[in-house]
Amino acid sequence: MQQPVNYPCPQIYWVDSSATSPWAPPGSVFSCPSSGPRGPGQRRPPPPPPPPSPLPPPSQPPPLPPLSPLKKKDNIELWLPVIFFMVLVALVGMGLGMYQLFHLQKELAELREFTNHSLRVSSFEKQIANPSTPSETKKPRSVAHLTGNPRSRSIPLEWEDTYGTALISGVKYKKGGLVINEAGLYFVYSKVYFRGQSCNSQPLSHKVYMRNFKYPGDLVLMEEKKLNYCTTGQIWAHSSYLGAVFNLTVADHLYVNISQLSLINFEESKTFFGLYKL
């Protein structure tokens, strides 16, 4: 069915959900309200859309009810034994720690006292086992170092035993020789420095010998002989050194002998004689 389109506004029909009444009952057609005169062919603008419905507020949990004073008191009474037990455990731990510390200090003091007593006993036992007399502890070591003496004019050589670097202890110096006062092992040494303005064919001899009433003659301990030690017509110098260990007895006399007395340089750093007990 064709309807005229020349109407001031579109007609609005009420539509029922019933299948038997597709159209609204008579009188249910809404007419456009008059809004003043309009010209022919003009249409009325559509009505504005309805405002959006406000969103419901977000759901929030209901507030908790306040605790009653009776429940608070019950909670406090429940925690008091726990707190008391924790404090009691801490105090017991501190007491045990202090007891252990005191016990360890006591054991350490006893150990120190025992160690000191053992050391004193050990030292006393050593003194009993190895008694030493004051003479033995204060006894000087046997040693001697004699230097060249320019006043020496005879054989065996004379030595300086007092001045300069000379020293003597535990032995005696007598007429150019060292006299042994205590038997034992000794290191004996001697050095002689020869020099000359011209060369000759005579050999240089340097020896250390010993005298004792047990032997009929001199006993040579060390000796050196040197040949071809210089060149004819030239100044020359030669150093002779002897040293060895010997088992000497009481009253042994040690001497030094050389071949040419006039060729010796008697400086204390170049010509000397000595020994020391091992």
UniProtKB/Swiss-Prot annotation:
It holds the Pfam family TNF. Residues 125-135 have a biased composition (Polar residues). The chain crosses the membrane at residues 78-99. GO terms for cellular component: caveola; cell surface; cytoplasm; cytoplasmic vesicle lumen; external side of plasma membrane; extracellular exosome; extracellular space; lysosomal lumen. GO terms for molecular function: cytokine activity; death receptor binding; tumor necrosis factor receptor binding. PROSITE patterns: THD_1, THD_2. Residues 1-77 are cytoplasmic. It comes from the Eukaryota. Glycans are attached at residues 116, 247, 257. CDD domains: TNF. Keywords: Apoptosis, Cell membrane, Cytokine, Cytoplasmic vesicle, Disulfide bond, Glycoprotein, Lysosome, Membrane, Nucleus, Repressor, Secreted, Signal-anchor, Transcription, Transcription regulation, Transmembrane, Transmembrane helix, Ubl conjugation. The keyword Membrane applies. Residues 26-68, 125-147 are annotated as: Disordered. It is found in: Cell membrane; Cytoplasmic vesicle lumen; Lysosome lumen. Expressed in activated splenocytes and thymocytes. Moderate or weak expression found in small intestines, kidney and lung. Residues 33-42 have a biased composition (Low complexity). Homotrimer. Interacts with ARHGAP9, BAIAP2L1, BTK, CACNB3, CACNB4, CRK, DLG2, DNMBP, DOCK4, EPS8L3, FGR, FYB1, FYN, HCK, ITK, ITSN2, KALRN, LYN, MACC1, MIA, MPP4, MYO15A, NCF1, NCK1, NCK2, NCKIPSD, OSTF1, PIK3R1, PSTPIP1, RIMBP3C, SAMSN1, SH3GL3, SH3PXD2B, SH3PXD2A, SH3RF2, SKAP2, SNX33, SNX9, SORBS3, SPTA1, SRC, SRGAP1, SRGAP2, SRGAP3, TEC, TJP3 and YES1. Cytokine that binds to TNFRSF6/FAS, a receptor that transduces the apoptotic signal into cells. Involved in cytotoxic T-cell-mediated apoptosis, natural killer cell-mediated apoptosis and in T-cell development. Initiates fratricidal/suicidal activation-induced cell death (AICD) in antigen-activated T-cells contributing to the termination of immune responses. TNFRSF6/FAS-mediated apoptosis also has a role in the induction of peripheral tolerance. Binds to TNFRSF6B/DcR3, a decoy receptor that blocks apoptosis. This is Tumor necrosis factor ligand superfamily member 6. It comes from Rattus norvegicus.
